[in-house]
């Protein structure tokens, strides 16, 4: 999601190919031996295999932009996975991971209380990289998250979900 949004914001036209992860086509493995998505194959044959690297390639950014993203991709993502997908792990307490993930969300709410976006006054790289994961965290229990006392985060996430750019990247490509 964040790779698609970065490419859209950078106005880079790409051909999107939807992949059924239960039935990965040989072309995916030909482009990337890892067989994971996203994969961006440039005209010169260069392959970029990670969403964060696609964001860097498309939009650049500073180390400051990526500091909060690194925290999200590390500790928060670990808690998100064990909260939302607890059945994939042994001996996992999803409520513990929800509580631990909430600490990061509380930090985001505090930051968003100072400015409209994580990047400051405008939607930027930290916003486009972190919002998809907050959306996933919310999807695990919408009612619970919506009841939390995080007004700045709720407003930020709602603006993201209602944005034309988000709606555009959520349209499924025709196979």
Regions found by a protein language model. Give the residues of each.
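GST-like domain detector, emphasizing the conserved glutathione-binding G-site
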Residues: 1-102, 109
């Amino acid at each position: 999601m964040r790779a698609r949004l970065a490419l859209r914001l950078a106005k880079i036209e790409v051909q999107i190919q939807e992949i059924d992860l239960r039935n990965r086509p040989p072309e995916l493995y030909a482009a990337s031996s890892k067989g994971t998505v996203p994969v961006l194959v440039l005209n010169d044959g260069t392959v970029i295999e990670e969403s964060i690297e696609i964001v860097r390639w498309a939009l650049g950014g500073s180390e400051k932009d990526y500091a909060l993203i690194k925290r999200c991709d590390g500790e928060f993502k670990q808690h998100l996975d064990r909260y939302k997908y607890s059945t994939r792990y042994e001996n996992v307490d999803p409520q513990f991971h929800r509580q631990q993930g909430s600490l990061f969300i509380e930090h985001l709410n505090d930051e968003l209380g100072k400015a409209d976006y994580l990047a400051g006054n405008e939607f930027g790289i930290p916003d486009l990289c972190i919002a998809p994961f907050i959306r996933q965290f919310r999807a695990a229990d919408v009612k619970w998250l919506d009841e939390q006392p995080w007004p700045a985060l709720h407003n930020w996430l709602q603006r993201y979900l209602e944005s034309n750019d988000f709606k555009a990247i959520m349209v499924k490509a025709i196979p």
